[in-house]
């Protein structure tokens, strides 16, 4: 019963995922062109999850749970995670107070220097052990990983004494174009049985759905988008064409003032229907030279599902992602 109550409780995530209440079992798609800080958003959420709530009298405000990170585009840099974690530990150790996940008077500053304060290496090692990483090089490895993930998570739970709260999939569409170009994928070299693009997507969704029944987690999946025209700086509102079950590649339109941006939804309908929440992130068209964040790229986030009538601007620093408007 306690596990069921925990699964139903909302998770208070960090920006830009803070606008919508999320629960274990939700599937959040973080879509956007490259670069748009999608992986940085995952890293910040991962640090929040693996940090303890409290350690030796210091409040860190974390969840103290495991993160399962599946890297599909094979470009994840573990050093970025460790540096972000170290920065958070030093920042908190220096303040001695509760971590402020929201805006401070000037949390962004103008440089990239880290606080001149040490951090607890024992705590750092404990947090890093709660980050579970798997790299897949093709759809076959991805499917094999999903089919065995239930047992991996069970062993991890027995080892660490805590459950996994986040299942992160970096670049869910990484193998889409390769699989689409191939007529089929062999399950075994001596087998006639083949996997089609549609069956791959169906199996992925089915395996994740079965996994969530046994190990309730919040799924955070990034996805690269194919964009058309540029946005305007005005508030972004989304309209979309009716999904066609016969054509998995649906043209979506995002409007901003008089300008429109089209992007193609290339993922199969079975995945689109599986997603419960979707947020679009992109580089803002602000001129950095005219802002106080001259050394930082400014990004824009917009919730498409559920649709919200406003958007957030944010920047990425060593300490994480911060909303600037």
Tell what function each PLM region has.
Residues 1-103, 110-116:
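The Walker A/P-loop phosphate-binding site
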Residues 26, 38, 77, 127, ...:
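Helical mechanochemical/support elements of P-loop NTPase systems and associated helical scaffolds
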Residues 196-325:
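Phosphate-binding/switch region of NTP-binding enzymes
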Residues 56-60, 91-120, 232-259:
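Intrinsically disordered, low-complexity domain-flanking/linker segments in eukaryotic proteins
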Residues 37-38, 76-78, 140-143, 174-177, ...:
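Eukaryotic short linear interaction motifs
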Residues 22, 59-63, 74, 124-126, ...:
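Intrinsically disordered, low-complexity regulatory regions enriched in Ser/Pro/Gly/Thr
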Residues 63-188:
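Conserved inter-motif catalytic segment of the P-loop NTP-binding fold
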Residues 5-13, 35, 140, 147-156, ...:
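Preference for well-ordered, secondary-structure-rich cores of eukaryotic proteins
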